[in-house]
Regions:
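Metal-cofactor-dependent catalytic cores
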Residues: 1-192
Length: 192
């Protein structure tokens, strides 16, 4: 989607009004809403079905080719193998579903991604795949601000935005397999 991004930016008031809908996401029985691979820089391809690999992450995505400032050797960060964003949060900032993939995440879910609901170590089972929520922070960037507005980026960085994980979560692959749009998501939290 290439467009005049500024035409779609929402005001701080409009964003604040939508937070209750994000908070109302299911805690335990979610659903996969969208799967996206990034085959090349700036490209997005939506999938109905995706393969997830223990090493590659989402097959066809360039995650494995991207370096990270968070790894000693500058290689890909294994704790950010697959990124997951709330479909309610992306709908809040992006509006039209055709713009969701611009957020740059790979899996969009209708599930409460908040820190209280999904502490580090929580396992998400979707389709045949298991993803573990990692402590690696998932934060907004200049591209996010350009596409969705500075107010959207600011909201993700507020205490509420961070607690709700509006920008999403990072995960690593525990079990490879197939995932499909429409798959249910089961949540297994770590033992206390």
């Amino acid at each position: 989607v290439t467009d005049n991004h500024a035409a779609f930016h929402r005001s701080a008031d409009d964003l604040a009004i939508g937070l209750d809908h994000v908070r109302d996401a299911p805690a335990d029985d979610g659903v996969v809403e969208l799967l996206v691979v990034r085959p090349r820089l700036g490209e997005r391809r939506e999938l109905a079905t995706a393969e997830v690999d223990l090493v590659l992450g989402l097959v066809g995505d360039t995650w494995i080719e991207r370096g990270s400032r968070r790894t000693p050797d500058g290689g890909p960060n294994p704790d950010a193998q697959v990124t997951v964003m709330s479909s309610r949060a992306v709908e809040l900032v992006a509006g039209d579903r055709a713009r969701w993939a611009l957020a740059g995440d790979q899996v969009y879910v209708d599930l409460d991604l908040s820190l209280d609901n999904l502490p580090t170590g929580t396992v998400l089972a979707l389709g045949e795949v298991e993803l573990e929520v990692t402590a690696a922070p998932h934060t907004g960037c200049a591209k996010f601000a350009e596409r969705f507005g500075t107010e959207a980026l600011r909201l993700t960085a507020t205490p509420d935005g961070r607690a709700l994980r509006l920008r999403g979560i990072n995960t690593r692959v525990l079990r490879a397999g197939t995932v499909r749009v429409g798959d249910r998501i089961a949540v297994r939290r770590p033992a206390s």
